[in-house]
Amino acid sequence: MTAQGGLVANRGRRFKWAIELSGPGGGSRGRSDRGSGQGDSLYPVGYLDKQVPDTSVQETDRILVEKRCWDIALGPLKQIPMNLFIMYMAGNTISIFPTMMVCMMAWRPIQALMAISATFKMLESSSQKFLQGLVYLIGNLMGLALAVYKCQSMGLLPTHASDWLAFIEPPERMEFSGGGLLL
């Protein structure tokens, strides 16, 4: 018997982590037993009955909205380095490729400026919507100014009086150069 009793006692120590649901108390412990001082409570350490509001999620959402609004506002400014590279690669000759590049460089900011009210609606949830709208507007105007500059460097803009009046002679070139040599 002692061997049998020792085995039961050993088994009890070995599986101390197990919850004994059958026994003198009926095995059902609720929230009322929590403060009874029993060592093997059903609740983990640090458990609270009341729900704690999570403010970090609201703060994270607000930060993400601000970040997204700044991404929208800075979008046109991020396109300017690529437009500068395209302007450089297209050259100043009047042909189909540079003309299409200039048209696209001018059309994108014009299209964005025509749809600026829809963009401002996306920025309404931000606390810095006026500054973001101003940055968006300046970025699009800079893109448009780059397109106008490229048109002027290609000679597509009428900048001389001879472009407007038929009786005025166009300006004469003083010299022609090619490949670094004077012709």
Curated annotation (Swiss-Prot):
The chain crosses the membrane at residues 67-87, 99-120, 128-148. GO terms for cellular component: EMC complex; endoplasmic reticulum membrane; membrane. Residues 20-39 are annotated as: Disordered. It comes from the Eukaryota. Isoform 1 is expressed in brain and heart. Isoform 2 is expressed in heart. One of its GO terms (biological process) is apoptotic process. Its main location: endoplasmic reticulum. The keyword Oxidoreductase does not apply. The modification N-acetylthreonine is found at residue 2. InterPro entries: TMEM85/Emc4 (IPR009445). Residues 88-98, 149-183 are lumenal. Residues 2-66, 121-127 are cytoplasmic. Keywords: Acetylation, Apoptosis, Endoplasmic reticulum, Membrane, Phosphoprotein, Transmembrane, Transmembrane helix. The modification Phosphoserine is found at residue 36. It is a multi-pass membrane protein. It is found in: Endoplasmic reticulum membrane. Belongs to the EMC4 family. Component of the ER membrane protein complex (EMC). Part of the endoplasmic reticulum membrane protein complex (EMC) that enables the energy-independent insertion into endoplasmic reticulum membranes of newly synthesized membrane proteins. Preferentially accommodates proteins with transmembrane domains that are weakly hydrophobic or contain destabilizing features such as charged and aromatic residues. Involved in the cotranslational insertion of multi-pass membrane proteins in which stop-transfer membrane-anchor sequences become ER membrane spanning helices. This is ER membrane protein complex subunit 4. The gene is EMC4.
